[in-house]
């Protein structure tokens, strides 16, 4: 039932609105379904039903927001050029443009390439400064802010970055499958420990089955984008159809990382327990070893080890090698776009510390 509800929200609500907007010659962007877990939906599928999937980041989210990672993932998976983001929400007058730039940079590094600024344009008074018409929220991005008349270079920078990050094809090594147990969204505690130097997208069953195929050991999308490895989130619950598709990918050489599922996610599929168990055994082998590697066709399945170990065994080199600080907040984020004659890397030093180090890029292009 929950899967049916999620499909209806994606197709009949967001899909219908998207069709109506297309017929009327309008763009349609939506924060589908947003951060809430109280809606029985599929965030990636729903975002894939709109012309411009949108996430959001708030000024207090200094360590990043995975909502924008969902939006950029949906844009990549469903072949959409723009991954939008509600930007700088609740930024206060005490925030400087330097503070806002660091927020913008991590959003760009998470895959956003359009900012819809959260601000209140309605400010009719000329004698009330700084003035606030945001219903209790701080909306500092208006003409009464002391830096407003000097902020053009800040906005020009955002426009240039967004323009560059719409060019070419995204380069993302890892596709993390979130399973099929609505509500489905990216939850950080269910992600494996992500190895530095590798970027990732997240997908759900609709995109996995209907948009991906295997080619030369990679997961390939219709527009030519590819992933090097399929990764299962922790305690990943999946349908028999998803399991079949994953097995087909592995047989054709796609490496898989993650633990074996215990049983079908849907009660309706319990009548197919025998086939489900056979598929699990084909992928993970007999017995229940805590860690191991199992071969199926041309591909390998890894579990019980770190993701970094599995990537090393598959000889998938980091896309970028750079220095991060010793503190959790001293992170480096990046995104990468591939063009016929050049690679575009955008790197965000997401800290207030200055690092001096060499950066190694995985590219054979003359220009990067």
Where are these regions (language model features)?
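Carbohydrate-binding surfaces of carbohydrate-active enzymes
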Residues: 1-368
